[in-house]
């Protein structure tokens, strides 16, 4: 299979962040939403298992993963805050439910004196964010069914829904990319629900399944 380790993972993330920064040049960027979580640690205990006990292929030790992920997040936030103030939102994930939560809080502590970095790292499974007329929902993708997300969005945050025109829900649970479109009863307000692809290579399970 494809060669992949922590060093390659870090390189891909930093390359992706720098690529987005490069593409944003020429625009008046006044706010950046940085989404973290989504199984970055991949495992949730010292035995190389997920929160529910499923063994995973990993490179290195559990504590190395934590240290590497923390410093990667710090580097990303530092890169982004040079451009504009950063809002960090953490998505609770099924592989590293507890350790990912701890990692997010450690990152918040790192930037505790930074007035240009804000955090939403609660245990809530779905997080919501408004920028101008844009309403953004975030979830790992292992919770509510995809078909239910648009109505959940309206029900859970009616005020945010009412004051926005453009609505998006981003999920991260699968490797391949899927996009659906929902319209309200009058067919004029759209909600786009999209799965974002992982920058990681497929492990043995995903490789066998063809992801």
Task: Describe each model-derived feature in a short phrase.
Residues 107-118, 123, 132-137, 142-211:
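Conserved beta-sheet core of the metallophosphoesterase superfamily
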Residues 1-5, 171-174:
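Short N-terminal secondary-structure initiator segments
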Residues 2-117:
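Core catalytic region of metal-dependent phosphoesterases/phosphodiesterases
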């Amino acid at each position: 299979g494809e060669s992949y380790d922590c060093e390659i993972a870090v390189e891909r993330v930093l390359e992706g962040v720098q690529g987005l920064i490069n593409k944003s040049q020429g625009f008046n960027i006044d706010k950046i939403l940085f989404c973290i979580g989504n199984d970055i640690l991949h495992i949730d205990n010292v035995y190389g298992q997920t929160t529910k006990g499923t063994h995973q292929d990993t490179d290195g030790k559990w504590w190395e993963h934590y240290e590497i992920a923390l410093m990667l997040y710090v580097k990303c936030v530092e890169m982004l805050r040079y451009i504009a103030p950063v809002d960090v939102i953490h998505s609770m994930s099924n592989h590293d439910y507890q350790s990912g939560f701890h990692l997010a809080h450690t990152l918040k502590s790192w930037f505790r004196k930074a007035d240009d970095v804000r955090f939403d790292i609660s245990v809530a499974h779905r997080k919501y964010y408004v920028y101008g007329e844009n309403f953004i929902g975030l979830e790992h993708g292992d919770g509510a069914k995809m078909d239910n997300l648009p109505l959940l969005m309206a029900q859970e945050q009616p005020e945010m829904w009412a004051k926005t025109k453009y609505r998006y829900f981003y999920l991260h649970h699968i490797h391949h990319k899927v996009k659906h479109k929902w319209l309200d009863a009058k067919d004029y307000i759209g909600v786009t629900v999209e799965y974002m692809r992982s920058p990681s290579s497929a492990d043995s399970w995903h490789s066998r399944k063809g992801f």
